[in-house]
Each structure stands twice: as C-alpha cells, then as structure tokens.
Amino acid sequence: MSTSEYDSYRPPEPEGGRRKRRRGGRGGSGGPEGPGGRRGGRGGNGRGGGWKNRGADGNREMPMVEDVEFTSYYGRPIVKAPPWGDEIGTYLFLGGLAGGSSLLGFGAQLTDRPGMRIASRMTAIAATGIGGAALVADLGRPERFLNMMRVVKVSSPMSLGTWILSGFGVGSGVTFAIELDRITGEKLLPLGPLRKVLHGMETPAAIESAFFATPLAAYTAVLLGATAVPTWNAAGRNGLPYVFVSSASMAAGGVAMALAPVAETGPARLLALAGTAGEAYAMSAMRKRMHPAEVDPMDDGEPGHKLHRAEKLLIAGAVGAAAVEVGARVFAKKLGGGWKTRAVLRGLSVVSGAALAAASAYTRFGVLEAGIESTKDPRHVVEPQRARLEERRARGITDDSITTGR
C-alpha cells in the first residue's frame, strides 16, 4: 500500500495506535449491529463502502493505486487525429503567401515600383485562388464553404477565417483585374465606360486586401492552436501565430525577389530578411516553452525532416538575400551596373527567393504533420498534462482537477 503527499494534511492518529478490526467479519461485530450502532458489512469507521473506505476520516492511510508509467488506453489514441492532408498544408502556405504579397503590392503602388507591384498582385490572387481550391477540395463540396458564411462566430477561428479569406479575395480580385487590364492594353476586358470606375477602385481595393493580409496569414495558427491536438495546442499557446506571420513575410519577400526586377525589390528583400529572423526566433522560443513530449513530433520522423529542411533553406535564402541587397547597393554602383553584374544579382535573387519560399512551405507542412503525429502516441497527451498538474500542485492549487483530492 502506498501513500500520497496528501497524508501530511490528515489529523494525527489517536493515542494507543491504530484500532484493530474486530472478529466476526468486516463489520463492527459478528451481529447485525456492532458497538456504537455500526452495522455489519460496513467499515469500522461507520462509512459506507466497506474496506475501501477504511481511513476515509483521515486517521490512517487509504488504499491507493501506485504510480505507473502510462502507455495507452488499450492501444488506442486519446485524441482523434484530424482528417487533414496535403490540401490543408497547401492552404496554410498559400494563405500566408497571399497575405504577404498583398502588403508588398500595396507598398509597391505607393512607392512607384510597377514591376514588383504587378508580380506581388499576381502572386496574391494566384495564391488565393489555388489555396481556396485546396480548401474546398478538403471540404469535399463547394457548398460547405458557402455554408460557413451563413453566420459570423467571433469565438470561432474557422468562422472568422472564412470571412477573412472572402474579404481578402474581393480586394485582391479587383487589383488583379486592374493589372490584367493594364497589361493587355485595356483591350481584353470589355468594360467600356466602367473602365474608369474599375481603375478608380484600385487604391480602396488595395487597402482592403492589405487590411485582411495579416489576419489571413495568422488566423490558421490560431485555428490549429484551438484544437485538442497536443503539439498544435501547445504551439498555439506559445507563439505559433508569430511563426506563421514571419513565415508569410519570408515567403512573400522571396517570391517577389524571384519574379520582380532586382532594382525594385529592395523592400521585398528587407521583408524577407525580417521574416527569416522572426521565424528563427519565434520557432526557437516556442520550442523552449513547450513540453518536451509536445516538441518530440517536431523533431522526429517526416515532420522533423521537413522542419530541419526549412531551417537549412531559411539560412541559405537569408544569406543569398543579404548578398543581393549588398550587391544591389554597393557593387552595382561601383561596377557601373554592367550586364554581368546584373545577371549575377538576378540569378542569386531568384535562387534565394525560391529557397525562402520553400522554407516557408516546409515550415507549414512540418507543423501540420507534427500535430497529426502527436495524436498517435498517448504519451504526448498524458505527460504534458501531468507536468501542468504538478506545477499547479507546487503553487498550492489542488482543487481544479479530478485527479487531486480535498
């Protein structure tokens, strides 16, 4: 028989030691009632439940199950894994890319950078369309997406995310139509007198898409953190939205570096470098604050491989982006901006931008798959719960869990 730390709270034993059980069974005597009116078949302390309640008045040890190492509930997982696949991973990546590209496009409009403006707006609408299609593919039928727009539930990240995506798509669609009309020489779209109206909506539409850009990049992290999946829930409490926003900035800056002229992508390079620094710091801080059992799925197996690839690509892309920035500011001026210099900088910009975008994609897929893996082993659920319980006990909180006594 074992004891618990709660034995320190029980009153001292009476003088003379422990009372011995009388003969005649587990009751107070052999008859129907023992001394003091206690009935046979009940424990010597007069409480119901027989031998299980011996010592329930606090005067001696109570039978307890000894501490055991938890393995599983009959070999079954405690938390059911969400039925999410590559479609959701694609949406996570493209949603962040769309949001970051929209911000870059708006900035390019304000600073008169037509090449980066066109590239960023085209990227934003393409990412929105493909990401939305991936989301619908995961839902199974398009009407399920429309059904989520029947209500607005502020407490639901999924409900808010539906409206964020829709609002962002409207603004991005208008700016895309304007850019398409410009590229085709105002000949493709039969707008007639409505052309001036369309072009007059450019700034309001750009502001709208920029307004929804950051929420679009961040809400998916809040959505994952609101689930019961161990790794996602812990990551959501410890900074996953910062990881996703930084990753989106890195991806958007990288794609702009790959598609737009080097002379115009200075803001994109700075955004990409800020995103790499932000993701590296936020990811490291998030891991340190999580329980080791919650971090394990992010280090092992295929999710761990993807997150390690993301780290390597992030470093390589950041070094390349910094080299392009230095080259564009220093060497191009000293060397006169010859075609060889421009070709080297252009090639390095494309490769570095692609590496940064790939790093962002690996981060999203790695986090997604790590959460799914964490549901397969009950240890990822039980050990963090026990650690949190012990922490509360150490602070004197013993009345907020069914596993603690009064």
Task: Locate each region found by the language model.
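Short amphipathic, positively biased membrane-proximal segments
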Residues: 1-406
